[in-house]
Curated annotation (Swiss-Prot):
Protein family membership: Belongs to the ClpS family.
InterPro entries in the cross-refs: ClpS, ClpS_core, Ribosomal_bL12_C/ClpS-like
Protein name: ATP-dependent Clp protease adapter protein ClpS
Self-association state and partner proteins as the record states: Binds to the N-terminal domain of the chaperone ClpA.
GO annotation, biological process: protein catabolic process; proteolysis
Provenance organism: Desulforapulum autotrophicum (strain ATCC 43914 / DSM 3382 / VKM B-1955 / HRM2) (Desulfobacterium autotrophicum)
Name of the encoding gene: clpS
Function of the molecule: Involved in the modulation of the specificity of the ClpAP-mediated ATP-dependent protein degradation.
Length: 104
């Protein structure tokens, strides 16, 4: 090891410090219910989460079959905004669609 090369301990602690600098991420989850149409869920996934029609359809089927599905991972503020947007749009259309966020 040369005098200018950092020790393993220095390199490791440097990597840990960088990782700790990232904000925590949150998964936004949509939950299945007996009233919200599959078409509306696909529309939400496209408009709110920027999914393609194909990807939105796959996520919607997961929600339908498994009871819930992950729409994406975001920082806390972005996840909160997306959850609130889903609830607002669902209520406007008379659907009880539920969206939550889970810390990763």
């Amino acid at each position: 090891m040369s005098l200018n090369e950092p020790s393993i301990k220095q390199r490791t602690s440097s990597k840990v410090e960088k990782k700790e600098g990232y904000p925590p991420m949150y998964r936004v989850v949509l939950h299945n219910d007996d009233y919200t149409t599959m078409e509306f869920v696909v529309q939400i996934l496209i408009t709110v989460f920027g999914k393609s029609l194909e990807k939105a359809s796959i996520i919607m089927l997961n929600i339908h079959k498994q009871g819930k599905g992950i729409c994406g991972s975001y920082t806390r503020e972005v996840a909160e905004t997306k959850v609130n947007t889903v609830h607002h749009l669902a209520r406007e259309q008379g659907f009880p669609l539920k969206s939550t966020m889970e810390k990763e």
